[in-house]
Amino acid sequence: MSQPPPASNLQKLRAALLSYPAALSALWAIPDRTAFADKVAEMGRGAGVDMAVADILAAMTPRGPKTPAMPVKGAGLSPSWMPSWLSITGQGARLDWVYAGGEAFTAPFADQDFARLATHPLNQLLPAISDPGELGSLPGPERPIDGMIFHISRCGSTLASRMLAQVPDILVLSEPQAIAAVLSAHTLIRIDPRVQQAWLNGVLGAYVRAAGTRRLVIKLDVDSLFDHARLRQASPQTPFAVLHRDPLEILVAQTGGSEPKPGLPPPEEVARWLAALCVTGARAVAAGARPVGYEDLAETVLDPDRPFLNLQIGPAYRARMAAVASLDAKSPNKRFTPDSLARQAAADERLKMLARQVIGPAWEPLAGLR
């Protein structure tokens, strides 16, 4: 087996490739590892770096936290690079970048798409990471993000994002980890709120640039609802939606119903968390977000008369979206099976009381019931 080439040669080759976006674009079209290495060797010779194909192949390693990283300056990366993972630990912090090449994100969650992209030879040869502190120096969104989706958990947000992903000119990022990590950074390190906001602006700006001419929709993870004001500050003209559902059905899904699984929080704790989400969701609606109930979700996303997130979508793509609505959002190879009645039936009196007394008073204003 070939040993990795001398670091100096590898560093020179990587630097040469990074400085030439057209080269990266050409390499992205070559998924075969050997053909990719052949082309890299040819490009290297043109840049004055002579490396054997075997050495290039040896330098292409699977991406992961233990992968020998390639430190870069985030500001020097082309728009095709996207923040894929932000890690903050007691040992330090790193922001991983993945070259996306303008590809669509079609998996239920962005992390799955980033993992797929990371297997491309280009991302294995160029395992780019940067100091998260540099996010503050990156430009924020240069245009408004086209839509953001918040939710109070288990209420169809993945379905909404999967439906929108059927439209070629819409890039949908479903719960990108880097955004959630920035929003929770203050729980792990001491960080000035203004710096944290600058980090958020930098991540969002990178995603907007990666979208290019496509419209960008971001579906946030559930706890990001608590930070809706920060996200609105980063892109104040963005249409927002808050998805919700009957609190008993969510509570059953989050607790396991009358037969809870070991390791889950007590139902009372889950109920208080859901109530807090509903209160925050109602505040987001008061600030201009659109509330959407689970039972109306598919019809709302497909409605041409009052477009969801103000997104204009033609009838042909609406037909594709409708077809996706008949599938399980998180397991697209399966047909969707309605589960509302089953969840209601799985609730014991304890859960019914919590849904009625703890969550209900917070959910009803969000749902427009009072």
Where are these regions (language model features)?
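Terminal, compositionally biased segments used for targeting/anchoring and flexible tails
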Residues: 1-76
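Generic alpha-helical segment signature
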Residues: 3-6, 33, 193-197, 274
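Short catalytic-loop micro-motif centered on adjacent basic/acidic residues
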Residues: 26, 215-219, 290-293
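PAPS-dependent sulfotransferases, especially Golgi type II membrane carbohydrate sulfotransferases
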Residues: 65-139, 278-291, 295-370
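PAPS-dependent sulfotransferase catalytic domain
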Residues: 83-87, 92-94, 100-101, 105-298, 302-316
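Surface-exposed cleft-lining segments at the edges of enzyme active sites
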Residues: 146, 215-216, 263-268, 323
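A polyampholytic, Gly/Pro-enriched intrinsically disordered region
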Residues: 191-202, 259-266, 335-345
